[in-house]
Amino acid sequence: MDIRAAEISAILKDQIKNFGQEAEVSEVGQVLSVGDGIARVYGLDNVQAGEMVEFPGGIRGMALNLEADNVGVVIFGSDRDIKEGDTVKRTGAIVDVPVGPELLGRVVDALGNPIDGKGPINAKQRSRVDIKAPGIIPRKSVHEPMSTGLKAIDALIPVGRGQRELVIGDRQTGKTAIILDTILNQKAIHDNGPEGDKLYCVYVAIGQKRSTVAQFVKVLEERGALQYSIIVAATASDPAPMQYLAPFAGCAMGEYFRDNGKHALIGYDDLSKQAVAYRQMSLLLRRPPGREAYPGDVFYLHSRLLERAAKLNDDNGAGSLTALPVIETQGNDVSAFIPTNVISITDGQIFLETDLFYQGIRPAVNVGLSVSRVGSSAQIKAMKQVAGSIKGELAQYREMAAFAQFGSDLDAATQRLLNRGARLTELLKQPQFSPLKTEEQVAVIFAGVNGYLDKLPVNQVGKFEQGLLSYLRSEGKAVLDTIRTEKAISDDTKAKLKTAIDSFSKSFA
């Protein structure tokens, strides 16, 4: 056998030269302890804050506490299969989710994995869940209406595109119903409106019952609204880290539309449960507790999330992301820690009350305590014209109604005020799943403000409204179309509208 030393040395040299180029370096650590959805890991020295790490069996986690001798990792999933001594791998990636139009019509979890059984989502883009909000320069003040389809809100507490409007109230006061009706109200625009007016909807369910989320999805599906919506669900049985992450994941999905010159709406239902999940994680990570045992940065948790809802200026595509965060109060206590935090972050609040709800005033909006800090710049001119006086009249009515309980002999002017107020309150009631177009709301409120309801018994107001709407949809279609296109009520339109309501009033008996 002939051994060629030169040849062998050439092969060895070549192997030595290329040695280590394909070697994949993956930094690993070891689990020191695990429990309550938190793992303490030793050895991930270069891990980044918020980085995704991988446990055996494909379970993912997120590094939150970077300490001198170990890393505190929250686990996205069950910690039952993780034991002391398991190896943990860095992924090198900060937590991200799929984004884009491919997610429309789907139900996903907080990491963007589909949970609706409709197959995989082939999204072309991914985005980090926790991005910095747009600065001051790329923004523009809110000036386009975001129509909810609810008279009480669109007339009195208008919400604009790019605004953050808090929906706050006790349990069972119809908070989710407001978000649901707002999503359903976008269907008409999606069916036959221009692309620039379409509003894509993201609904984030945090810590809710699975049956509730399933019911929500079913309603959207039956009414054809799921096609322009994304549902992100972290239900009550999901681990706390998923409930903490879900709003950020939903926000990243909404931001895709905002940054591409489109309009999106996101509802967080509800942020109280996210704060509770965050408190649980923080206490288990042994971070110092503050007021009500919430960690010191719980304000920052919500402010950095809600600041991402914005209206961008024309140079940045003129897109918008509107946020409707929900907060659940306990016994109407708006001065608790989380409610006051979120009230101070948002641009106004819609305050719902149990008493109003049980009196049959639904949506149960307390018009006195609710406010929109964007105000009438988020309304079309026609709505400003008719709804301008209604808030004042209702405020006077509430004040007088309190006095009227004591005295029986009221002068005619006070009596008129009370009559008008009772009828306007009745007019603002609206059944669920029946949002109205803006021009229809304008016509109905016009009738109320101009005294057409004053002679009717209060219990006939709803019937009058339904009759008037069906009459206008058939006979007065031209007037409604004019209001929609001109977005204002000229003297000519006003005369036509009065004529239409007059002719209907004669036939209504």
From Swiss-Prot:
It is found in: Cell inner membrane. Pfam families: ATP-synt_ab (PF00006), ATP-synt_ab_C (PF00306), ATP-synt_ab_N (PF02874). InterPro entries: ATP_synth_asu-like_sf, ATP_synth_asu_C, ATP_synth_asu_C_sf, ATP_synth_F1_a_nt-bd_dom, ATP_synth_F1_asu, ATPase_a/bsu_AS, ATPase_F1/V1/A1_a/bsu_N, ATPase_F1/V1/A1_a/bsu_N_sf. Its main location: membrane. It is a peripheral membrane protein. Gene3D superfamilies: 2.40.30.20, ATP synthase alpha/beta chain, C-terminal domain, P-loop containing nucleotide triphosphate hydrolases. One of its GO terms (cellular component) is plasma membrane. Its EC number is 7.1.2.2. One of its GO terms (molecular function) is ATP binding. It catalyses: ATP + H2O + 4 H(+)(in) = ADP + phosphate + 5 H(+)(out). The keyword Cell inner membrane applies. It comes from the Bacteria. ATP binds at residues 169-176. Produces ATP from ADP in the presence of a proton gradient across the membrane. The alpha chain is a regulatory subunit. F-type ATPases have 2 components, CF(1) - the catalytic core - and CF(0) - the membrane proton channel. CF(1) has five subunits: alpha(3), beta(3), gamma(1), delta(1), epsilon(1). CF(0) has three main subunits: a(1), b(2) and c(9-12). The alpha and beta chains form an alternating ring which encloses part of the gamma chain. CF(1) is attached to CF(0) by a central stalk formed by the gamma and epsilon chains, while a peripheral stalk is formed by the delta and b chains. Belongs to the ATPase alpha/beta chains family. This is ATP synthase subunit alpha. The lineage of its organism: Bacteria, Pseudomonadati, Pseudomonadota, Alphaproteobacteria, Hyphomicrobiales. The gene is atpA.
